[in-house]
Structures are given as structure tokens and as C-alpha cells.
């Protein structure tokens, strides 16, 4: 059986995503398509523009058979942790092929680079340290070290060096690395992205970036939004915004975040993943000097810290993501598979494989404790403590996210534990 897996955020689902999905299906001709999707907080260190269930509903209407949620312990990590959690989840579900978008179709180059990252040759490590000493951020230092290593030791790829630069190529590289790291049988494929660059903030018509579309939603430019997304995506975006559940964005969270930070002293930051190189002192000082989150980020920013890294650190504080929890999750993998929605084809598949899975399926959040205890007494390969921590962080993420809806009544009614799975019939 051919099962296509894709890693998505759909923040929000737009015409470029639809193009990728169609091309992926044409390439694999799968019997089933599964998407692992970030929940309410995404990899760029921000809240999603809409909640997890509304984005899953759009994905199902686009033709995906099963949508599962990537636990938040992975969704707000850097490219490596994000890819690891995503690939691990898809592997647990029996996915045979993964297709990702990149700015290059050069799978041979990505394969070579992923080997370098896994094996970490002495020369590469030395080059990386040299670039870090110049004050470059880790992602930029790593790109520079990889480019230098290729020039020195793999001259056949010298002409392809510039392809390393683009963000989607780095993410594709991490998918390959994750597949090798967990020794998965998944076969990776890449298709060239189309349309605007991932971070392009400007409206470019039908193929605008998610960044540009989010700005249009926030500013209420609905005619332009309509051009950039499929009709079913537009209808659900409009519905969620009419319900005052959209848009959610980082600026809305600003005072909440600054309030949390102002309660902390430098030593408190050791409890949160990723705080190194004096960042604790910067966070303490800037949180007390600034009144908006954009101002805070500018205050903390330095050459070696990207804005995205700083925003992820904020998420680690908000969601109480400790070094131990992240390291343990990256070592042991997801402890459950949380299903957000399926169609008839997806439902049938889950019924067939449910008893063969190594981790339990979770379809109703309110039953998670019952599912966990049943799993422990059964044949599942899970860690009870890690299961609880991963699940509690997902629920916490949803509870915090709902605070930023624009209607108090909606906030009160938004209980993640009561959410029902989305089932698209027919």
C-alpha cells in the first residue's frame, strides 16, 4: 500500500499549498495521504492565524485523508526538531513516501548534506566553530560551514553550493536527516516550490506567501485574500474570523508575554529550553524596558540570534518547555498520535492499523488519561511520564491560544478537551 506523508502548517492553506499537494499526489499516486500538521503554535515561533481544527478541516477539504497534530514540543523547535517529530509521526503511521517542497529538486545534494550533518566530520565541525566565532547565528554558521566543506571535499557539488541558502532547502535537508536518524523506511521526494518566497511579505496575486496572506487577514483585505487561497479555505477563514477566533498573532500576545517575562529572574531561564550565550540577561532587561513584543525582539536581537530563534524561545517560556522535556522527546519520539480529522478513506485506514501501532491513537482529547493507562497495560512502546508531559503541553498550548480570541464568550466556550474529531463524509 502506498501512503503519502506531508508535513504542513497551512497557516493558512493557500494556492501554493494546493499546488504542492496536487504535485505530490501526481508523483506518488498514493492509496492514502496523511498530513502531520502543527497545532496552535508553529515553527516560526508564533501562534497560528487560526486554530488547529479549522486548519485541519481545510486540509481535509483539499483532499488529505488523515490530519494528525504534531505535538507542540516539536512544532516550536528549530528545523531539526520540527523535522524529527514530523518524520517520526509519519513513520509511526506507516507512511511509505514523504514529499516536501524546496527551492531545488536536487535530492542528491540534500542526501550528501544530510550525511555530513549526521556523521559530523572533524573538518566540518572545525569549520562550524570558526564561523560561530565570527558572530554568525547557528543556522548561518552551519550553512557557511557546509558550503566550505563542499568546496574542500566534494567538489562535484561546488556548483550547487548556493542552493543551501534557502529556508525550504534547509528544512528538506532536515527531513532526510531525520529519516536516517530514526532509521525509517520512508522514501523522500522533493518538488520545486512555486510562487512567492516563503517569507515574502508582499501580495503577489494567486501565489502569495503565507506571510503575506496573514498580513492581509490581519488588516482585513479580504478581496486579496480571496485571490490567494482556494474557495473552501477562504470560506473557513471568513467563518472563523466572523466567530472572533481569527486572526491570532504574536502582537496580540505581547503584554501577556511581557507580563510572564517580568516575573522571571535570570536563574529562572535555565528551566526553559534554548537559553544560552547570555540570552537570559537580555530577556530580563528588555522585558522591563519594552511595551510591545516587536520592540522587545528588536531590543534582544543581536547578530548571532535570528528573530525566529528569539520567538521560539518566547514559546518555550510560555509553554514551559524545559531542556529535559525537549531532549527526551527528541530521543524517544512522539508518545501518541493525535488525530484531528479524517475522511472515509482515512477512517477505514485507521481502523485497520490501530492495533498494529507502537503508540496509541488519540481522537478525543478528554480521554487522553484513559488512553494512556490502557496503552501502558497493553503492547505499546510508550513512556508514561513523557506521554503526560507531551499531552499536557498540547492542552496548555490550546488553552493559552484561546485567550487571544476577540470575544470573551468564545474564549469561555473554547475548551480543547471538548473538541470533536472532524469527519468529512463522502
From Swiss-Prot:
The family database entries (InterPro entries) matched by this protein are listed as: Rossmann-like_a/b/a_fold (IPR014729), tRNA(Met)_cyd_acetate_ligase (IPR008513)
Q: What does this protein do?
A: Catalyzes the formation of N(4)-acetylcytidine (ac(4)C) at the wobble position of elongator tRNA(Met), using acetate and ATP as substrates. First activates an acetate ion to form acetyladenylate (Ac-AMP) and then transfers the acetyl group to tRNA to form ac(4)C34.
User: What are the record keywords, sorted?
Assistant: ATP-binding, Cytoplasm, Ligase, Nucleotide-binding, RNA-binding, tRNA processing, tRNA-binding
Q: Which gene encodes it?
A: tmcAL
The terms under GO molecular function for this entry are: ATP binding; ligase activity, forming carbon-nitrogen bonds; tRNA binding
State the taxonomy lineage. Answer: Bacteria, Thermotogati, Thermotogota, Thermotogae, Kosmotogales
What GO terms fall under cellular component here? cytoplasm
List the GO biological process terms. Answer: tRNA modification
Residue positions binding ATP: 7-20, 101, 168, 193
Q: Where in the cell is it found?
A: Cytoplasm
Q: Which Pfam families match?
A: HIGH_NTase1 (PF05636)
As for family, the record states: Belongs to the TmcAL family.
Catalytic activity from the UniProt record: cytidine(34) in elongator tRNA(Met) + acetate + ATP = N(4)-acetylcytidine(34) in elongator tRNA(Met) + AMP + diphosphate
Q: What is its EC number?
A: 6.3.4.-
Q: What protein is this chain from?
A: tRNA(Met) cytidine acetate ligase
Amino acid at each position: 500500500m502506498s501512503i503519502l506523508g506531508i508535513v504542513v502548517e497551512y497557516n493558512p492553506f493557500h494556492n501554493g499549498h494546493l499546488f504542492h499537494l496536487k504535485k505530490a499526489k501526481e508523483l506518488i499516486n498514493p492509496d492514502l495521504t496523511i498530513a502531520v500538521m502543527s497545532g496552535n503554535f508553529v515553527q516560526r515561533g508564533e501562534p497560528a492565524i487560526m486554530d488547529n481544527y479549522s486548519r485541519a478541516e481545510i486540509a481535509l477539504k483539499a483532499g488529505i485523508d488523515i490530519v494528525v497534530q504534531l505535538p507542540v514540543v516539536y512544532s516550536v523547535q528549530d528545523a531539526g526538531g520540527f523535522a524529527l517529530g514530523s518524520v517520526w509521526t509519519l513513520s509511526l503511521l506507516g507512511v511509505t513516501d514523504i514529499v516536501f517542497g524546496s527551492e531545488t529538486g536536487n535530492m542528491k545534494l540534500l542526501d550528501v548534506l544530510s550525511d555530513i550533518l549526521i556523521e559530523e566530520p572533524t573538518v566540518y565541525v572545525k569549520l562550524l566553530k570558526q564561523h560561530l566565532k565570527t558572530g554568525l547565528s547557528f543556522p548561518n554558521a552551519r550553512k557557511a560551514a557546509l558550503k566550505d566543506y563542499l568546496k574542500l571535499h566534494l567538489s562535484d557539488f561546488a556548483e550547487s553550493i548556493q542552493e543551501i541558502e534557502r529556508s525550504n532547502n534547509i528544512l528538506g535537508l532536515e527531513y532526510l536527516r531525520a529519516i536516517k536518524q530514526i532509521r525509517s523506511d520512508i522514501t523522500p521526494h522533493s518538488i520545486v516550490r512555486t510562487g512567492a518566497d516563503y517569507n515574502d511579505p508582499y501580495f503577489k496575486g494567486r501565489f502569495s506567501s503565507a506571510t503575506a496572506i496573514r498580513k492581509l487577514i490581519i488588516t482585513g483585505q479580504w478581496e486579496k485574500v480571496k485571490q490567494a487561497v482556494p474557495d473552501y479555505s477562504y470560506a473557513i477563514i471568513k467563518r472563523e474570523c466572523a466567530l472572533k477566533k481569527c486572526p491570532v498573532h504574536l502582537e496580540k500576545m505581547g503584554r501577556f508575554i511581557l507580563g510572564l517575562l517580568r516575573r522571571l529572574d535570570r536563574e529562572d531561564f535555565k528551566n526553559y529550553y534554548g537559553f544560552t550565550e547570555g540570552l537570559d540577561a537580555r530577556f530580563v532587561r528588555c522585558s522591563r524596558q519594552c511595551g510591545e513584543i516587536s520592540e522587545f525582539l528588536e531590543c534582544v536581537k543581536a547578530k548571532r540570534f535570528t528573530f525566529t530563534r528569539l520567538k521560539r524561545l518566547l514559546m518555550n517560556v510560555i509553554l514551559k518547555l524545559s531542556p529535559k522535556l525537549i531532549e527526551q522527546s527528541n530521543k524517544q519520539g512522539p508518545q501518541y498520535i493525535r488525530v484531528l480529522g479524517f475522511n472515509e478513506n482515512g477512517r477505514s485506514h485507521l481502523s485497520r492499523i490501530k492495533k498494529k501501532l507502537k503508540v496509541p491513537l488519540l481522537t478525543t482529547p478528554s480521554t487522553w488519561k484513559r488512553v494512556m493507562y490502557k496503552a501502558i497495560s497493553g503492547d505499546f512502546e510508550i513512556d508514561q511520564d513523557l506521554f503526560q508531559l507531551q499531552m499536557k503541553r498540547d492542552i496548555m498550548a490550546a488553552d493559552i491560544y484561546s485567550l487571544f480570541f476577540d470575544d470573551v464568550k468564545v474564549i469561555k466556550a473554547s475548551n480543547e478537551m471538548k473538541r470533536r474529531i472532524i469527519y468529512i463524509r463522502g
